[in-house]
């Protein structure tokens, strides 16, 4: 019975270690992970949105960058909307790997609450932001390079 349990444990360990090896592609190398958020900012509110990004997003994500949780962040605009509710601003956040996303999720709340002054102030700012912008979609993508 002990041999069977030992064998099962070893098999489980080999499967756990071997899984990443199987996940490697012969076609590309894995790169960083990107989260892209597509936002629709209401007409006439774009300046308020950009000011919010400058006052809140940038200082927080610059600190996250210092902490090593993100590699970079970028903003994109959509010059050709397909319909009135289409996105007009996209925010892209680059993470070194999936693990840094988990690490950041666990630790960033403290920094975020400190920036806003309190948890309630953070919630109030999010409610205010929701008055002039809507998150259309949030996507995760792994950057890859061809071999």
Task: Please report, for each region that a protein language model flagged, where it lies by residue.
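Acidic/histidine-rich, surface-exposed loop or edge segments in extracytoplasmic proteins
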Residues: 29-44, 89
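Hydrophobic pocket/interface hotspot
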Residues: 37, 49, 91, 101
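An amphipathic, aromatic/His-enriched active-site/gating alpha helix that lines ligand/cofactor pockets
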Residues: 25-28, 59, 63-71, 86, ...
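N-terminal, post-signal-peptide region of Sec/Tat-exported proteins
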Residues: 42-90
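Positively charged n-region of N-terminal signal peptides that target proteins for export
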Residues: 1-4
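Short beta-strand/turn micro-motifs at beta-sheet edges
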Residues: 23-27, 77-80
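Bacterial N-terminal signal peptides
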Residues: 7-20
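Short, solvent-exposed mixed-charge patches
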Residues: 146-147
